[in-house]
A protein has these predicted regions:
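Short Lys/Arg-rich amphipathic alpha-helical segments
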Residues: 26-29, 50, 68, 101, ...
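Short extracytoplasmic
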Residues: 56-92
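Soluble extracytoplasmic domains of inner/organellar membrane proteins
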Residues: 84, 89, 99-208
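Early exported N-terminus immediately downstream of N-terminal targeting peptides
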Residues: 95-96
Length: 208
């Protein structure tokens, strides 16, 4: 029994000695873990709060349209891009603002909104839409080479028909009618439904 007590005492002393040497490291490690957990939870709370606030602001822009509301739309988009860029609403607001700006003839603002989506959005589908519309802006600005460069960029296959159709439009603007016809024919292969009639009309207008 005495041997057992001695062995236990030695273990206790060894543990005390180890704790004396390593307690600071253990406590610091524990503190770091607790800080990390708190940071993760805090970040998640921050993201949820940001998303909720952005959603409320987005309601404003999604309910507006028309030239009379253009400044409000642009201001709201700017606010979302500046303060809530990491949320899903910023890119969507930018697309709305770009569309309304384009309709109003403000091509510079439309371009800046669309370029922001291309550069900053983490959603490939939105980037593809923005790049397509940016090519349309470039065409209106009489910059066909830039438009073609945008349309030749990698994109989801779901957008092939729209990209090829606009490519045909750009080639028509350049006077390259044979290439335009080929682009329209390729677009028809990628398009279903009633919209085919529009592409067919463009192709037929080019002639044989």
């Amino acid at each position: 029994m005495a041997v057992y007590d001695l062995e236990e005492q030695e273990k206790i002393e060894a543990l005390r000695s180890w704790w004396k040497e390593n307690s600071k490291f253990v406590l610091l490690t524990l503190a770091a873990c607790l800080i990390a957990i708190a940071a993760v939870n805090g970040w998640r709370w921050y993201q949820r709060t940001q998303a909720a606030e952005a959603a409320e602001i987005f309601k404003t822009i999604s309910s507006l349209s028309g030239k009379e509301n253009l400044s409000k739309i642009q201001e709201t988009s700017q606010r979302l891009r500046a303060d809530y860029a990491a949320t899903a609403y910023a890119a969507r607001a930018a697309l709305i603002s770009a569309e309304e700006s384009f309709k109003a003839g403000d091509l510079a603002r439309a371009r800046s909104e669309l370029q922001w989506v291309v550069d900053e959005s983490r959603e490939p589908g939105l980037v593809d839409i923005a790049r397509l519309r940016l090519a349309g802006v470039a065409l209106d600005e009489k910059k066909p080479e830039e438009a073609l460069q945008l349309l030749n960029a990698p994109h989801d296959a779901a957008f092939d028909g729209l990209y090829l159709e606009l490519k045909g439009d750009v080639l028509v603007a350049q006077g390259k009618l044979n290439e335009a016809r080929d682009a329209y024919n390729e677009a028809l292969k990628k398009t279903e439904g009633a919209y085919r009639a529009i592409i067919e009309a463009k192709r037929d207008a080019v002639g044989e």
